[in-house]
């Protein structure tokens, strides 16, 4: 039985995505699903080679064939997932292997629909999520989500950015039970080039671009 599906959408990250895969603990109750979104570098070839060289990792590699965008790629990843929980490991991030492994061990001890973890960011600071402020919204990277809870929810494929925000909004309307683990398990590449916050700060994304 698959406890956790680790989902990675990737586009032109031929080196960083391998670092993320290297950080994943090797265990029999997880699966890793990577979907390439029409990369023009060696990303897809590197992923296929990695899969061949690491049979200890239960891994599937898919290709969109052309660039479909983050939302469409995320929807395809979710459709392929088999785990009771899923987690998005972004292609330029890594997990803190031992802590992440511990958190997977503890997943069944949580009764929540969402299990949140704390994040380590680029400057060495730790984002300790504050339960009193409902901070599990902060990034999709900080959450293990029970797959059955979000059945029927999809990422909107017609927005230019912020697709994870719309997914989160619809998910929260279902009033999930959120549990905060307090475990620092994810190394978040923040601020990341191309993030919603980064694009808005540089004037490359306007509020009207965030309309579904």
Describe each PLM feature range:
Residues 13-26:
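Short, well-formed alpha-helical segments that are part of the catalytic scaffolds
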Residues 16-18, 41-50:
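Acidic helix N-cap motif at the loop->helix transition within catalytic regions
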Residues 36-45, 66, 90:
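A conserved acidic beta->alpha catalytic loop
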Residues 64-81:
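Glycine-rich, basic loop-to-helix element that forms the pyrophosphate-binding segment
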Residues 86:
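Short aromatic/hydrophobic "clamp" motif used to bind/position activated sugar donors
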Residues 94, 98-128:
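Conserved donor NDP-sugar-binding/catalytic core segment of glycosyltransferases
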Residues 118, 178-185:
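Catalytic beta-strand/loop signature of glycosyltransferases that borders the donor
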Residues 160-167:
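Acidic donor-binding loop at a coil-to-helix junction in glycosyltransferase catalytic cores
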């Amino acid at each position: 039985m698959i406890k956790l599906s680790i989902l990675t959408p990737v586009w032109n990250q031929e080196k960083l995505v391998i670092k993320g895969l290297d950080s994943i603990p090797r265990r029999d109750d997880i699966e890793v699903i990577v979907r390439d979104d029409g990369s023009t570098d060696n990303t897809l070839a590197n992923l296929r080679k990695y899969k061949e060289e690491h049979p200890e990792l239960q891994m599937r590699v898919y290709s969109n064939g052309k660039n479909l965008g983050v939302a469409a790629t995320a929807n395809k990843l979710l459709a392929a997932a088999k785990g009771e929980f899923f987690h998005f490991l972004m292609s330029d991030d890594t997990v803190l292997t031992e802590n992440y492994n511990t958190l997977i061990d503890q997943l069944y001890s949580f009764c929540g629909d969402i299990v949140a973890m704390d994040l380590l960011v680029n400057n060495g600071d730790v984002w300790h999520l504050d339960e009193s402020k409902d901070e599990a919204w902060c990034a999709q990277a900080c959450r293990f989500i029970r797959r059955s809870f979000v059945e029927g929810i999809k990422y909107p494929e017609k927005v230019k950015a912020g697709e994870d925000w719309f997914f989160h909004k619809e998910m929260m309307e279902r009033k999930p039970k959120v549990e905060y683990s307090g475990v620092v398990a994810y190394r978040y590449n923040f601020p990341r080039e191309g993030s919603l916050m980064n694009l808005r700060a540089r004037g490359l994304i306007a509020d009207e671009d965030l309309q579904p």
